Amino acid sequence: MEQADSVTFYGVAMDGRQGISLDNFSVRGSSGLHLRSIPLHTLCDFQRLRPYDLIVVQYGLNVATERGVKYDGYKKGMLSVIEHLKTAFPETSILLVSVGDREYKNENGDLRTMPGVKNLIRYQQSIAADSHIAFWNMYEAMGGQGSIVDMIGQKMANLDYTHINFKGGKHLAGILFETLMYGKEQYERRKAYEEE
């Protein structure tokens, strides 16, 4: 029997055979670029053992900065991440979810949406378009400019003016679910129309 010096675990699955299964590969503070470092053969094993219908990629909030204008390096890296995932999961749909609102205090001490957030979202839209994957703008779903402040007022976000909490996540998940179901309904209508 061979012994290894170390072992890397990506998770343990204890799902039933019915219903929806959700795997979450979260890394706090990650830009998402770490996904490139998962060996392709490991991802292909995931595909073989746990074939996914949908992969949701939602990273990047800590990439946004107060003065962030260009995120070309991030875009290049994320394009390679998406390509890596598409290679391992060729039959799986991929959805890129944008960053949400993030506030900072301007020179007058007023809370404002960090300028880098809007710029990063434009880059994320471009990543999705260039990769031919779906895109969902969480910033707009939150309410756009200054929305994290409103969510804090509704106890749906943390006082760091950056991160939503469980209640906020549940709220946004409901909006995303409705969006996905609407898209599915429209797809089925179009498909039925084309088959007539």
Predicted regions and their residues:
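Active-site beta-loop-alpha junctions enriched in small/polar residues
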Residues: 27, 60, 99-101, 141
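Generic hydrophobic alpha-helical scaffold/packing signal
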Residues: 44, 79-86, 125, 173, ...
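Conserved SGNH/GDSL esterase-like catalytic core that processes O-acyl groups on lipids
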Residues: 1-80, 87, 163
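Short, conserved beta-strand edge motifs with alternating hydrophobic and charged residues
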Residues: 57, 95-98
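A short helix->loop->beta-strand "cap" motif at the edges of active sites that frequently abuts
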Residues: 89-94
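Aromatic/hydrophobic pocket-lining residues that form the small-molecule binding cavity
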Residues: 74, 78, 82, 121, ...
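Catalytic His-Asp segment of secreted/periplasmic serine-dependent ester chemistry enzymes
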Residues: 40, 101-196
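Hydrophobic/aromatic beta-strand patches that form the interior of the parallel beta-sheet core
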Residues: 23, 95, 134-136
